[in-house]
Design a protein with these regions (language model features):
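TPR/TPR-like (Sel1-like) alpha-helical repeat modules
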Residues: 122-144
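Conserved structural position within tetratricopeptide repeats
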Residues: 1, 31-35, 68-69, 104-105, ...
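Terminal, low-structured helical/coil segments at or just beyond the last alpha-helical repeat
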Residues: 143-172
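Canonical tetratricopeptide repeat
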Residues: 11, 46, 80-82, 116
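Structural signature of tandem alpha-helical TPR/SEL1-like repeats
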Residues: 19-32, 54-69, 90-102, 126-133
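Helix-start (N-cap) detector for alpha-helical repeat units in TPR-like alpha-solenoids
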Residues: 6-7, 41-42, 75-77, 111-112
Length: 172
């Protein structure tokens, strides 16, 4: 039965949250999956991601670290990027920076890491580096500024987007 399959629960929760469903309800589904299998690295990764989207940055970091510990060699998702993004959303740009650099190195084809890194550099006042990252991002995708409705907090959306606008040289 799907209700007892951690993989189905986690995938459904992530997909529905991405489409804008109630994130608290989706986190309950992920929590259920982790009750069924506490060693499910992908479940911890998705939990960290949803917690970051919900603005629960400390829990996002903790759950993403668990995913990395459970699956240190085979990545089950961009947990390092989630940790960097959570530090960024908590306005700890100095802590976010090394994680986002590592995330970009781990998966140079993932545009998310470039976006978070460019925004982080911009908020640190390092605009030349932010613009260089945007150049690299454009080699991966033409979409520099994405839809950020996954971030449930208007403050977090604006923090991320304002950094990207600075990085591309747009007016704040």
């Amino acid at each position: 039965m799907a209700g007892d399959d951690p993989g189905v629960l986690v995938n459904a929760a992530y997909t529905l949250a991405d489409f804008g469903e109630n994130i608290s309800t989706m986190m309950v589904l992920v929590d259920r999956a982790l009750e069924l299998n506490p060693n499910f690295a992908r479940g911890w990764y998705i939990s960290g991601t949803l917690r970051a989207w919900a603005g629960q940055t400390e829990i996002a970091i903790e759950h993403s670290k668990i995913a990395l510990r459970l699956s240190p060699r085979v990545r089950v998702g961009p947990s390092v990027m989630t940790i960097g993004a959570a530090h960024f959303l908590a306005r700890r740009f100095d802590e976010a920076l090394p994680k986002l650099l590592l995330a970009m190195q781990e998966d140079p084809s993932h545009p998310g890491a470039y976006r978070w890194l460019a925004s982080c550099y911009a908020h640190m006042g390092r605009l030349d580096e932010a613009r260089q990252v945007v150049k690299q991002l454009r080699a991966v995708t033409p979409d520099v500024i994405p839809n950020v409705s996954f971030l449930r907090s208007a403050e977090h959306r604006e923090l991320f987007l304002s950094g990207l606008r600075l990085a591309i040289g747009a007016e704040p």
